[in-house]
């Protein structure tokens, strides 16, 4: 199990190291527009899972949304601290 901060650190490391075949690297390379489409898609899936599926399914969809939001943050150069200042 990972925390939000640990996931951000892992994704940042992957983007810096650029391992071959990394989905994270591919998503970053696709750009903000493509990442934004994934964020919207995952947000809709969270909503549908919360309305019609189990808590486990909703939690899985939320985890995927958090992943895509973090890739957006990395693509834009937004740190966790930048976000935490607004909480």
UniProtKB/Swiss-Prot annotation:
It is an enzyme of class 3 (hydrolase). Its main location: cytoplasm. Its EC number is 3.6.1.31. Pathway: Amino-acid biosynthesis; L-histidine biosynthesis; L-histidine from 5-phospho-alpha-D-ribose 1-diphosphate: step 2/9. It comes from the Bacteria. GO terms for molecular function: ATP binding; phosphoribosyl-ATP diphosphatase activity. InterPro entries: HisE, PRib-ATP_PPHydrolase-like. One of its GO terms (biological process) is L-histidine biosynthetic process. It is found in: Cytoplasm. GO terms for cellular component: cytoplasm. It catalyses: 1-(5-phospho-beta-D-ribosyl)-ATP + H2O = 1-(5-phospho-beta-D-ribosyl)-5'-AMP + diphosphate + H(+). Keywords: Amino-acid biosynthesis, ATP-binding, Cytoplasm, Histidine biosynthesis, Hydrolase, Nucleotide-binding. Belongs to the PRA-PH family. This is Phosphoribosyl-ATP pyrophosphatase. The lineage of its organism: Bacteria, Bacillati, Actinomycetota, Actinomycetes, Micrococcales.
């Amino acid at each position: 199990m990972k925390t939000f901060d640990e996931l951000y650190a892992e994704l940042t490391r992957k983007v810096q190291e650029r391992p071959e075949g990394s989905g994270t690297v591919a998503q970053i390379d696709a750009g903000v527009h493509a990442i934004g489409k994934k964020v919207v898609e995952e947000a809709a899936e969270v909503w549908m899972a919360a309305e019609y599926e189990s808590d486990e399914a909703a939690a899985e969809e939320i985890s995927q949304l958090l992943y895509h939001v973090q890739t957006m943050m990395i693509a834009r150069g937004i740190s966790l601290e930048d976000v935490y200042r607004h909480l």
